[in-house]
Amino acid sequence: MDKMAYKFIKWFEELRKDDVPLVGGKGANLGEMTNAGIPVPPGFCVTAEAYKYFVENVKVSKEDVKKILGEKANKGTIAEVLASAPDEPRTLQEWIMDIINRTNVDDSKQLQENTAIIRELIESLEMPNEIADEIKQAYKELSQRFGKDEIYVAVRSSATAEDLPEASFAGQQETYLDVLGADDVIDKVKKCWASLWTARATFYRAKQGFDHSKVYLSAVVQKMVNSEKSGVMFTANPVTNNRNEIMINASWGLGEAVVSGAVTPDEYIVEKGTWKIKEKVIAKKEVMVIRNPETGKGTVQVKVAEYLGPEWVEKQVLTDEQIIEVAKMGQKIEEHYGWPQDIEWAYDKDDGKLYIVQSRPITTLKETTTEEVEEVEEAEVILKGLGASPGIGAGRVVVIFDASEIDKVKEGDVLVTTMTNPDMVPAMKRASAIITDEGGRTSHAAIVSRELGIPAVVGTKEATKKLKTGDYVTVDGTRGLVYKGIVKSLVEKKKKEEAAAAPGAAVAAAPLVTGTLVKVNVSMPEVAERAAATGADGVGLLRAEHMILSIGQHPVKFIKEGKEDELVERLAEGIEKVAAAFYPRPVWYRTLDAPTNEFREMPGGEDEPEERNPMLGWRGIRRGLDQPELLRAEFKAIKKVVEKGYNNIGVMLPLVSHPEQIRKAKEIAREVGLEPHKDVAWGIMIEVPAAAIIIEDLIKEGIDFVSFGTNDLTQYTLAIDRDNERVAKLYDETHPAVLKLIKHVIKVCKKYGVETSICGQAGSDPKMARILVRLGIDSISANPDAVQLIRQVVAQEERKLMLEAARKKLLEEEEEEEDLF
């Protein structure tokens, strides 16, 4: 079998960077660098088509599944899947998607269990001979290049979504080092395929909006570098965003120790052009990863002091000449790609040469630099480490040691652990800051922290010993300091720091231009400046609830006690703060929409009715019209702000289901001197299916805009209480019925020139954003931390639409030309 006869194999020499759909980001980049003359160890890729062939052609019966899983088949999601599955065999892909579609990715336990079952199925099923035979032949050819029957190789997974700009999937799938023999290679390729379904990879795809059924996996098989020293380099400083600096991390043995964060590596900063070594931090390198001496293959972690000698622990890994050699190689690779790179490198102890084993674009680079945070004299520094992700975070400490404990970390906690491995991503998203004992600034965990915009300090050596769950700390992710307690002066600077460091800051400095506006949801006036700093095109939802309920008393009772003026003043102050922060960008204020159970818990709420399902009860515009004193106070507050010159405010009525509700609300507004359509824009929420169905009648009553409240619209359309765990798995904002309602409303609104938007949770979901752009929505309102991501997704989808339109036009023109002849 010669190379040209391969169906599922591609050699590096045959690949370029555009081959991501075929061999994934890792494989495509290795091919690109090979052809650019970069010293890359030779190898081949088992293409994504092989994985696709495997899952779409291997048939599995119910009995096969039960036999593979044993007792596990009788409980949880898989038991439900088996109960509803047809008797005839199904493809592996059908089994996988059935399990995934029933999985709530935010339920850590369920996610871990279900993805483990998928991996077990993949690893237990036999690889088709058509693929296995090609792998054996290619491995034989690669070995013969070096005059051997078998050589050591690294088998790395390469996902087809791995290095897309908006999704830092780095390290989400597995790598197997020092693999020897064709059978072992085949086994590791299957393990790579299975690693597409780790909990962390599945969680990432879900949160980044990737369709699970369309992400495939290639496996890279590459000659192993017998590393004496290795590491990672960033050709732009990932902490300060300085593109004139190269950051190099280095340690002994294989690079796995640096990437995983098992060791705190040496760190060198090199200035581009002058090649001056600006900074050297020589770390205590306690451990290293080597080829397992007992089995002759695979890897093992050993202590540096025992394997190399005590003097090697604090010895500089790279000579100054090698530091510059590595830096220059990084610059060469960056120049080739035209963008800063995240590169894994190694020196081979057999020939002493430098090799590049991987390169990918830095996906977390921002256009702005973080403002320095001054050290606070009166605060007590209790830990020092490496600032891995800039910003200030403060909160209650939760110490965990492995992924089984991640549910202990609640929203706003400070996550403390030995090293934050990728399995902890769900907890990292909830944390206000992250502190680790080990790891460097180029470890995978540090990269993910920067991507999530969460302050992180790594390599403190003793965080898990010094801190205990329940302590309170303040974390400075820029300087690498951890302070005892909540340091007020730093926390007060947090808003400014976050505005500089958050993903949205880059957008504010150099916004992507999109036809679809990207707005932001605001719950509290206190965060208005931070929300405005995201570069959002306005506020698609300003919630009234926090401002009104923060008075600490039932608002109707408050008014009856003669305090209406005080309520109006408080409301006006909050609305003005947001209107000013965004002026002249529009701010849509949604009138009060708190359910009765929230009112009942307040002082003075004793007379609130007991409702079995408050979400279907006395709330929104229904209550506003029944208790017009509430609506009147809100409109008076808006009028005060308008009279100060803020003409960027819109009024949005929640839970509208009849034209009469719009008419009556306008009458109340006019009673206080607020003129709809003149003083303020006037709009409604589309949350009730009835509103979507009679949208034309509602428009004729006079509205300027509508906004989809997808949380309620989905619940009401599907008759699902998403807080009921028995049916929550059926909750789906992309259900065809929900999308049909949205599509209908957008179509009718376009006919009448009414602006359309969305402000539900779905507005922060990339998958939903792509759908909405294609449906022609005018704007999408996202949560502050999702604005940049949604803007990137919108820009990408709009480019696709333009490209599709251009291609269609070109085809039509070609057909017209053919008709002429």
Swiss-Prot record:
Disulfide bridge positions per record: none
Alphabetic keyword roster: ATP-binding, Kinase, Magnesium, Metal-binding, Nucleotide-binding, Transferase
Active site, UniProt feature: 444 (tele-phosphohistidine intermediate), 759 (proton donor)
Cofactor(s) the record lists: Mg(2+)
The record's note on its domains: The N-terminal domain contains the ATP/Pi binding site, the central domain the pyrophosphate/phosphate carrier histidine, and the C-terminal domain the pyruvate binding site.
Function: Catalyzes the phosphorylation of pyruvate to phosphoenolpyruvate.
UniProt protein name: Probable phosphoenolpyruvate synthase
Species assigned in the record: Pyrococcus horikoshii (strain ATCC 700860 / DSM 12428 / JCM 9974 / NBRC 100139 / OT-3)
